[in-house]
Design a protein with these regions (language model features):
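Edge/loop elements at the starts and ends of beta-strands within beta-rich repeat scaffolds
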Residues: 1, 23-28, 47, 135-140
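Conserved interaction-surface patches within small, structured recognition/assembly domains
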Residues: 15-23
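General beta-strand recognition
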Residues: 31-33, 53, 117-118, 143
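A short, polar/proline- and glycine-enriched secondary-structure boundary/capping micro-motif
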Residues: 41-46, 64-68, 128-132, 153-156
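Acidic/charged, solvent-exposed loop-and-adjacent secondary-structure segments enriched in E/D, K/R, S/T
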Residues: 52-84
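Gly/Pro-enriched, hydrophobic low-complexity segments
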Residues: 94-165
Length: 165
């Protein structure tokens, strides 16, 4: 299935907008493409749990810190399953803890509708990334916001359609 979103990216006060496309290539790999609204490709990645390949990227975005940050973001966003270590409850959500490498992921499932509404990626001491989801069903989110706390980066994705031909 292809996921197509209108994307707005704010990085250090600079704004980019365009189209974000994520396509599942096989069971483990996704291809992620970000283009301008006119169709010019800004970045093109292939990403899986263990592999990452940059197919193309424009010179202005070709920075190691940005590429590694986007790799982390897209892995969190496109991950199919998590190994849960602990479960917590708060007033609004069931919270599931997963531990990966040097960070923890907290998955917040709404008690009201039983949908994923937030993923928090954190070190032992502080939050690094929050992913917020607004969805109408359990297949895809109509809005996704990726907010960083260690760098000035915010990505907002608004759903356009489910398939492109």
């Amino acid at each position: 299935m292809d996921y197509v979103y209108k994307a707005n990216i704010t990085i250090y006060g600079n704004e980019l907008s365009g189209i974000f496309i994520a396509k599942r290539i096989n069971d483990t790999t996704h291809r992620v493409v970000f283009t301008t609204e006119f169709g010019n490709k800004l970045l093109d990645f292939e990403i899986s749990e263990n592999d990452f390949k940059v197919n193309s990227i424009v010179d202005e975005l070709d920075r190691k810190i940005l590429i590694n940050t986007l790799k982390t973001d897209f892995r969190l966003l496109l991950k199919n399953s998590y190994v849960i270590q602990q479960q917590y409850d708060n007033s609004a959500s069931k919270v599931y803890l997963t531990e990966e490498d040097s960070s923890n992921n907290y998955l917040f499932i709404s008690k009201a509708d039983n949908k994923l509404n937030k993923i928090v990626n954190a070190t032992k001491r502080k939050e690094r990334i929050n992913l917020f989801f607004t969805s109408e069903n359990n297949i895809f989110a109509i809005k996704i916001v990726i907010q960083h706390y260690n760098i000035k980066l915010r990505i907002e994705l608004n759903y356009l359609q489910t398939q492109i031909n």
